[in-house]
Curated annotation (Swiss-Prot):
Gene that encodes the chain: pdxH
One GO biological process term: pyridoxine biosynthetic process
Organism for this UniProt entry: Thermobifida fusca (strain YX)
Cofactor names: FMN
Protein name per its UniProtKB record: Pyridoxine/pyridoxamine 5'-phosphate oxidase
Tagged with keyword Oxidoreductase: yes
Residues involved in substrate binding: R10, E11, S12, Y13, K68, Y125, R129, S133, R195, M196, H197
Gene3D superfamilies named in the record: Electron Transport, Fmn-binding Protein, Chain A (2.30.110.10)
Region (Disordered): 1-21
HAMAP family registered for this protein in UniProt: PdxH (MF_01629)
Role summary: Catalyzes the oxidation of either pyridoxine 5'-phosphate (PNP) or pyridoxamine 5'-phosphate (PMP) into pyridoxal 5'-phosphate (PLP).
Note describing how the cofactor binds: Binds 1 FMN per subunit.
Classification lineage: Bacteria, Bacillati, Actinomycetota, Actinomycetes, Streptosporangiales
Length: 221
């Protein structure tokens, strides 16, 4: 096979049918069921999700971030508020994430609005992070900004390591914290044979995401 030609790369999907009668009324309950199955399938980082945002000039941008919590209210992730995504979400909170669970022929897309988490939630999670990751948050104060070279980053990290040696509590930087992506629309995709995939979309029609009414529609593949 000529791997230089993407058109020659094909994969047959053989996922089980997605029966609408078995879908949970609430999308985050359905997400919980699928996320559990993705973890049980021992996928590499099933909590990895592609986050898409819109820059102040209207240009889209995307990157992979890690899901760090979820419930019926939405999905939680953490970042540097000064990063490209942090700045984008501060100005335009609309965003979407994709969970690409290729190995089990599934994908979940969540569209919604990002809200900053409270200082209490941010402090609690930051305190749980490995010591090295805490230092990294301080060393990369202006995430996404250009740096001269790797040595500049290493020097910044070394200064932080000297200031907070192992066993020393590391405070959370004020520019570091989390977001809650509050869902407004969620799509579940199950790969099927002959590209006749099963797709179901949840759309919030009234109330809050956690207790409101969701309309479920089958979408054409």
């Amino acid at each position: 096979m000529d791997y230089s030609d993407p058109a020659e790369l094909r994969e047959s999907y053989d996922g089980a049918p997605l029966d609408p009668r078995g879908l949970a009324p609430q999308p985050m309950d359905q997400f919980h069921a699928w996320f559990t199955e993705a973890c049980e399938a021992e996928l590499s980082e099933p909590n990895a999700m592609v986050l898409s945002t819109v820059d102040p000039d209207g240009a889209p941008s995307a990157r992979t971030v890690l899901l760090k919590g979820y419930d019926r209210r939405g999905l939680r992730f953490f970042t540097n508020y000064r990063s490209r995504k942090g700045v984008a979400l501060a100005r335009e909170p609309r965003a979407c994430v994709v969970f690409p669970w290729h190995a089990i022929r599934r994908q979940v897309i969540v569209y919604g609005f990002a809200e900053r988490l409270s200082d209490e939630e941010n402090d609690a999670y930051f305190a749980q992070r490995p010591h090295g990751s805490q230092l990294g948050a301080w060393a990369s104060e202006y995430q996404s900004a250009p740096v001269a070279d790797r040595a500049e980053l290493d020097r910044a990290y070394a200064r932080c390591a000297e200031q907070w040696p192992p066993g020393t509590p590391v405070p959370r930087p004020e520019y570091w914290g989390g977001f809650l992506l509050v869902p407004q629309e969620v799509e579940f995709w199950q790969g099927r044979s002959d590209r006749m995939h099963d797709r179901f979309r949840y759309r919030l029609v009234s109330g809050t995401p956690s207790e409101g009414a969701w309309q479920i529609d089958r979408l054409s593949p």
